[in-house]
A protein has these predicted regions:
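Interhelical loop and adjacent transmembrane-helix boundary motif
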Residues: 235-283
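Cytoplasmic-entry segments and transmembrane alpha-helices of multi-pass inner-membrane transporters
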Residues: 101-140, 304
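Generic hydrophobic transmembrane alpha-helix motif, especially the helices
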Residues: 126-171
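C-terminal transmembrane helix and the adjacent membrane-cytosol boundary/short C-terminal tail
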Residues: 180-184, 188, 195, 262-304
Length: 304
C-alpha cells in the first residue's frame, strides 16, 4: 500500500499552467516522433506493395541479372543489371575522387587554415551544398561533357566518367562538413602529446587526429555515398542515358535513379510497375547504406 501511494505521488496530474504546458509539449514531441516513424513505415510499405508485383511477373533473377532493358519494345525486356552496376560504379568512382579531396579539405580547415581563409573556404563549401542539382547538371552538360569529348577524342562526352566527376563534386559538402566537426571534437591533449614527443604537425594530423575522428569521418563518407547513389537530375544530364553495361568509363550509361526519372512520365502497365521495382531496389540500397552508417557510428563509439 505504501509503494502504491508513493507511485501516485510521483505520477501527479498537471495542476499549474506550467504543468499543463509541459504535458502538451511532451505530447507534441511524441506526435512528431511518431510522425517520423509512420512516414518511414508508410514509405517502406508503399515501395514493397508497388515494387513486388513486377518482380513477381518478370522473375527476380531475370529482373536483377539480365543485361537488356527494352521497356517499350514489342516484346519488352526488363533487365536492370546495367542500371545497378552503373549506380555502383558511379558511386564508387565519386567516392574515390571525392573522399580524399573532402578529407584533406577538412584537415586543412580544422587544423591548418588561418581564420580568414577558413571563413572563405567554409562559406564556399556551404554555398556548394546549396546549389541545386539541375545547376550541377547544366554546368556539367555545358562544360564537362564537351571537355571530356575533346580531351579523350570521343564523339560524345556524356558518359560514366562525366557522371562520376559531377557526383564527386556534389558529395564534397557532406564529407567536408561532417569531417570538420569530427576533427574539431578530437581532444587537444591527443595532439599536444604527439607534438611533445617530437612528431610534426602533419604526422600528428594523420596518425593521431584522423584515427581519433574516424567514426565521424566515416559518417560523412557514408552520407556522401548516400547522396551520390540517390542523385538523378544532374546525372541524367551528363551520363548519356543509354541502357548499356558500364564496361568503360566513356560508355553512355543509365543509373537506377535516371532510369526512373526518364521513363516515369510516359510509362504504363508493366513498364510502370517495373520502374517502381527499380525504386524498390534503390530504396533497399539506401537502407543498407543507413544500416552501415549506424554500424560504423556504434563501432566508433565502442572504440572511444
Amino acid at each position: 500500500m505504501k509503494n502504491t501511494t508513493s507511485s501516485l505521488r510521483r505520477v501527479r496530474l498537471p495542476r499549474t499552467p506550467a504543468d499543463w504546458l509541459e504535458a502538451v509539449m511532451n505530447f507534441i514531441f511524441f506526435l512528431c516522433g511518431m510522425l517520423a516513424v509512420c512516414c518511414v513505415v508508410l514509405i517502406s510499405v508503399y515501395m514493397v506493395v508497388s515494387g513486388v508485383p513486377a518482380i513477381h511477373k518478370i522473375g527476380i533473377f531475370k529482373f536483377l541479372f539480365s543485361t537488356k532493358w527494352a521497356s517499350t519494345a514489342a516484346e519488352p525486356l526488363f533487365g536492370i543489371l546495367p542500371f545497378i552496376l552503373s549506380s555502383v560504379y558511379g558511386t564508387l568512382g565519386a567516392a574515390i575522387l571525392g573522399v580524399p579531396i573532402g578529407l584533406l579539405t577538412a584537415v586543412f580547415l580544422s587544423k591548418a587554415a588561418d581564420p580568414k581563409l577558413r571563413t572563405v573556404v567554409v562559406t564556399a563549401i556551404e554555398l556548394l551544398s546549396g546549389i541545386p542539382s539541375v545547376v550541377f547538371g547544366l554546368l556539367g552538360m555545358q562544360v564537362l561533357v564537351p571537355a571530356a569529348a575533346k580531351t579523350f577524342g570521343k564523339a560524345s562526352g556524356a558518359c560514366l566518367l562525366s557522371a562520376i566527376v559531377v557526383l564527386s563534386i556534389m558529395i564534397l559538402p557532406s564529407i567536408v562538413s561532417v569531417s570538420v566537426t569530427a576533427l574539431n571534437a578530437v581532444p587537444p591533449e591527443y595532439e599536444q602529446g604527439s607534438l611533445a614527443l617530437g612528431a610534426t604537425d602533419t604526422e600528428t594530423w594523420f596518425k593521431i587526429s584522423i584515427p581519433a575522428a574516424k567514426s565521424g569521418i566515416a559518417a560523412g563518407v557514408v552520407l556522401g555515398i548516400g547522396r551520390a547513389i540517390g542523385e538523378a537530375m544532374a546525372v541524367m544530364m551528363v551520363a548519356g542515358n543509354s541502357p548499356n553495361m558500364p564496361d568503360s568509363l566513356f560508355r553512355s550509361v543509365t543509373l537506377l535513379t535516371t532510369a526512373i526519372a526518364k521513363e516515369m512520365s510516359y510509362a504504363g502497365g508493366l513498364q510502370r510497375q517495373a520502374l517502381f521495382s527499380i525504386a524498390l531496389v534503390l530504396f533497399v540500397f539506401i537502407m543498407l547504406i543507413n544500416v552501415a552508417l549506424n554500424v560504423v557510428l556504434k563501432g566508433g563509439n565502442r572504440d572511444e
